[in-house]
Amino acid sequence: MIFKVFYQEKLTEVPVRENTKVLYLEATSQKDVRKKLNKFAYNIEFVQSVTGAHLEYEKQNADLILAEIV
């Protein structure tokens, strides 16, 4: 399943909408997403599953590039 993750790069700063970044990640659940991103110390604001028509829309209208977390 593909997830869209909204995050701030610095865990210590107050979230500001203009600084929110987005990445797409393949994982089995939201818990798995948070586990994979835990080592980066991101301030994760929201994790959203992307499927069906929403996924097709993101592929056409966004820079949908799956992040590879090692």
Curated annotation (Swiss-Prot):
EC number(s) from the headed UniProt entry: 2.7.7.6
Keywords carried by this UniProt record: DNA-directed RNA polymerase, Nucleotidyltransferase, Transcription, Transferase
Quaternary structure and partners: RNAP is composed of a core of 2 alpha, a beta and a beta' subunit. The core is associated with a delta subunit, and at least one of epsilon or omega. When a sigma factor is associated with the core the holoenzyme is formed, which can initiate transcription.
Top-rank taxon: Bacteria
Species classification: Bacteria, Bacillati, Bacillota, Bacilli, Bacillales
Gene Ontology molecular function, alphabetical: DNA binding; DNA-directed RNA polymerase activity
BP-aspect Gene Ontology terms: DNA-templated transcription
Gene name per UniProt: rpoY
Family: Belongs to the RNA polymerase subunit epsilon family.
Organism: Bacillus mycoides (strain KBAB4) (Bacillus weihenstephanensis)
Its biological purpose: A non-essential component of RNA polymerase (RNAP).
Gene3D superfamilies xrefs: RNAP, epsilon subunit-like
Pfam families found in the cross-reference section: RpoY
Gene Ontology CC terms, in alphabetical order: DNA-directed RNA polymerase complex
Protein name per UniProt: DNA-directed RNA polymerase subunit epsilon
Reactions catalysed: RNA(n) + a ribonucleoside 5'-triphosphate = RNA(n+1) + diphosphate
